């Protein structure tokens, strides 16, 4: 698979019709896991374009495992097992680099994930609750999707962020669920000041509309709770109280 993704090039301007292309370029760098170089004139980049760099920084040092290496001329399914990365969750990247739609069906048990599971997608913020053990994804041509995979233990948990493609593994720490106080808390840190969101799964038995946040602002109150936070190089604490 790719051992050197070369320089990341996404241009300096926002080009909506090329959004999926830019996403794929950024994901290719992430699945490599190694050093990245900037292929654009950074000083002239729109913030939206520069973000394709920042979501890869810092690099993780972990390359994904291509699950279909011997099935296709160019692999499309990449897995980061948490047992190898040391992350608290698995990551799965799908890259449809063809001119035809693709339907994917992945048995999570083949990835070492058993029982009820959750799959949170980085770009679209879609959440899939998986009861039958299969993640089913339909991708249009030339499209990439990137999932954080979690076991559903029936308690609130961090399912992702929009700060980094590891979705919490490099930027979130000290996460704790206190069942007596009904609070979920943690800290977030980034190389520099940065605004973004932490996404929390709120299972049945908890009312997300009654949630109260400290150190963050609640931007949506569905089963996936979006917390807007201001991160910095110093760890920033956050907490969500789920009132009875």
Question: What residue spans do the PLM features occupy?
Answer:
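Active-site-proximal substrate-binding groove within the catalytic cores of carbohydrate-active enzymes
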Residues: 1-127, 132-153
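Short amphipathic beta-strand and strand-loop transition segments with alternating hydrophobic
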Residues: 79-83, 174-177, 217-218
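Hydrophobic residues embedded in beta-strands of well-ordered beta-sheets
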Residues: 90, 135, 182-184, 225
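Non-cytosolic beta-sheet module surface loops
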Residues: 96-98, 108-110, 139, 188-192, ...
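Short beta-strand/loop motifs in extracellular/secreted proteins, especially
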Residues: 102-104, 115-117, 194-198, 206-209, ...
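Solvent-exposed beta-strand/loop surfaces of large extracellular or lumenal domains
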Residues: 116-134, 210-229
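C-terminal beta-strand-rich structural cap/linker in extracellular carbohydrate-active enzymes
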Residues: 131-169, 223-244
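Accessory, solvent-exposed terminal regions and/or long lumenal/extracellular loops of proteins
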Residues: 153-209
């Amino acid at each position: 698979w790719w051992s050197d993704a070369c320089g990341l090039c996404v241009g300096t301007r926002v080009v909506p019709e090329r959004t999926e292309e830019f996403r794929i370029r950024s994901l290719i760098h992430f699945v490599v896991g190694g050093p990245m170089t900037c292929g654009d004139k950074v000083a002239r980049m729109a913030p939206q374009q520069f973000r394709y760099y920042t979501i890869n920084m810092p690099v993780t040092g972990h390359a994904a495992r291509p699950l279909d290496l011997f099935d296709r001329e160019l692999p499309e399914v990449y897995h980061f097992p948490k047992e190898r990365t040391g992350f608290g969750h698995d990551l799965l990247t799908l890259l449809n680099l063809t001119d035809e739609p693709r339907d994917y069906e992945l048995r999570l048990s083949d990835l070492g994930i058993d029982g009820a599971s959750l799959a949170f997608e980085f770009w679209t913020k879609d959440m899939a609750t998986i009861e039958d053990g299969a993640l089913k994804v339909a991708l249009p041509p030339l499209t990439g999707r990137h999932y954080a995979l979690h076991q559903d233990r029936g308690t609130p948990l961090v399912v992702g962020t929009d700060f980094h493609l590891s979705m919490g593994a490099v930027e979130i720490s000290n996460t704790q669920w206190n069942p007596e106080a009904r609070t979920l808390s943690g800290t977030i840190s980034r190389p520099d000041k940065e605004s973004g969101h932490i996404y929390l799964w709120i299972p049945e038995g908890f009312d997300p509309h009654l949630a109260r946040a400290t150190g963050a602002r609640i931007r949506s109150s569905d089963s996936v709770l979006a917390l807007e936070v201001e991160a910095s190089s110093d760890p920033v604490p956050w907490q969500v109280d789920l009132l009875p």
